[in-house]
């Protein structure tokens, strides 16, 4: 079962979103000529759970068990609304056909900064920082070796072809190892714990005046970080002109204030 609850706030862009109704999906299936697929995902995923329309508020929370359709609903909305996303989404051959059957009502134009943020985005970010720093560390060792070779090795200038080498030697001999290294490579990107990195990712990506869809943002966050994230999201809604729609299992995020609650 998929549920949702809303919190009224100061700024809303999306008023409601209509997913494909069962009769529309059934008509599409009757007209579909391709028979080589085992699944027509996302067809019948949401209508089979009774979700054909979602009325949104300034803060809308989707919750339910695994497989209830939370992530599917958010991804369909993000694609239909042309929101920014980082990690690629695995679309099925029937995705475009499904999107054509969806519609929505806006209260305000959706800002260009609006985006969907998924668990994959956060994990990819942490892996990227780690890989970047590993690359910098390897490059630093190479620079150390170059410095020692240029500073203390034997060198004779014999032709203009040696000019670049002469410049490197002079630079090494006129600088300390630390200064020589800083000039040639970037600084490491600061790494935090997984929980702090995840929390910082959300605070970096969620700005002012935007529509943000969050898919299980509690992943990788400790209970204390989940509570901190809930306060940040509420402040973003109340004071920063944000509309937020999120799917979650977290009791800390589910505990955020909601003015109405519906079972669908």
Q: What are the language-model segments listed below?
A:
Residues 4-51:
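N-terminal pre-Walker A segment at the start of P-loop NTPase domains
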Residues 57-91:
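Phosphate-binding glycine-rich loops of NTP-binding sites
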Residues 66, 116, 135-228:
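Conserved ABC ATPase signature
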Residues 247-249:
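H-loop/switch region of ABC-family ATPase nucleotide-binding domains
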Residues 81-110:
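Flexible phosphate/Mg2+-sensing switch loops adjacent to catalytic phosphate-binding sites
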Residues 208-211, 237-245:
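Loop/turn-to-beta-strand initiation segments
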């Amino acid at each position: 079962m998929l549920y949702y609850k809303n919190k009224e706030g100061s700024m809303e862009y999306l008023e409601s979103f209509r997913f494909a109704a069962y009769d529309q999906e059934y008509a599409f299936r009757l007209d579909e000529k391709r028979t080589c697929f085992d699944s027509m995902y996302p067809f019948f995923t949401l209508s089979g759970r009774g979700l054909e329309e979602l009325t949104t508020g300034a803060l809308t929370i989707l919750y339910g068990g695994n497989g209830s359709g939370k992530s599917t609903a958010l991804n369909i909305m993000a694609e239909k609304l042309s929101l920014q996303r980082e990690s690629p989404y695995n679309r099925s051959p029937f995705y475009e056909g499904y999107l054509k059957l969806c519609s929505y009502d806006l209260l305000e134009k959706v800002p260009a900064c609006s985006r969907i943020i998924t668990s994959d985005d956060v994990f990819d970010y942490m892996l990227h920082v780690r890989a970047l720093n590993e690359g910098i560390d390897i490059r630093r060792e190479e620079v150390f070796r170059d410095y020692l070779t240029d500073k203390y090795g034997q060198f004779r200038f014999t032709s203009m072809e040696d000019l670049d080498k002469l410049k490197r030697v002079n630079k090494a001999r006129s600088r300390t190892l630390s200064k020589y290294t800083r000039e040639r490579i970037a600084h490491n990107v600061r790494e935090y714990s997984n929980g702090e990195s995840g929390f910082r990712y959300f605070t970096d990506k969620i700005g002012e005046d935007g529509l943000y869809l969050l898919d299980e943002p509690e992943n990788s966050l400790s209970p204390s970080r989940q509570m901190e994230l809930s306060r940040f999201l509420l402040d973003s809604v109340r004071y920063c002109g944000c509309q937020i729609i999120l799917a979650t299992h977290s009791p800390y995020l589910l505990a955020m204030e909601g003015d109405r609650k519906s079972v669908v």
